[in-house]
Amino acid sequence: MNTYKNSLNHFLNLVDCLEKIPNVGKKSAFKMAYHLGLENPYLALKITHALRNALENLKTCASCNALSETEVSEICSDESRQNSQLCMVLHPRDVFILEDLKDFLGRYYVLNSIEDVDFNALEKRLIGENIKEIIFAFPPTLANDSLMLYIEDKLQHLHLTFTKIAQGVPTGVNFENIDSVSLSRAFNSRIKA
């Protein structure tokens, strides 16, 4: 029985909590707990304050389901954005990733889960904002292909254009490291050089 570890319940609880963060293992969690608890307690207090503020203020946009600190997100209330395109993504974090690219200036819709989609409200939004194209920005999987077909079927009466982001060979990756479906799609979706 290790009585030393038993005497550090609060510290070990912090390690356990940090370890529950995705992609953080036991060693990294221990290093973070040690740093925050002993080497930089001021940073720990700042993180605590920032975490509390985020939890108290974060919500999802009533229009697009993206993260927001207001009822309607800045993206949805920005009149300079293009109204003709709506980019559908699976998760709120996908909006962050696409916004960082600065390639898309339209609107978003975060699915979260297909069971939660209010197709009547979505249809009203598509008509009200004069959306002409839905861009599916989903990772390439058979399940997501089925999801796209399902959504297209539910909204086909609106006569929208449905597109999806291109798939292909990632930059700097050798063919032997690419699955055959991705390589085949890239080959069949080739463009003029």
From Swiss-Prot:
Family note? Belongs to the RecR family.
Keyword Ribosomal protein in the entry? The reply is: no
Return the protein name: Recombination protein RecR
* C4-type Zn finger ranges: 61-76
Organism, as annotated: Helicobacter pylori (strain J99 / ATCC 700824) (Campylobacter pylori J99)
Lineage top rank: taxon: Bacteria
Cite the Toprim domain residue spans from the record. 84-170
Q: Give the protein's biological function.
A: May play a role in DNA repair. It seems to be involved in an RecBC-independent recombinational process of DNA repair. It may act with RecF and RecO.
Q: Write down a Pfam family by its short name.
A: RecR_HhH
GO terms classed as biological process: DNA recombination; DNA repair
| This protein's UniProt keywords | DNA damage, DNA recombination, DNA repair, Metal-binding, Zinc, Zinc-finger
Q: Which CDD domains match?
A: TOPRIM_recR
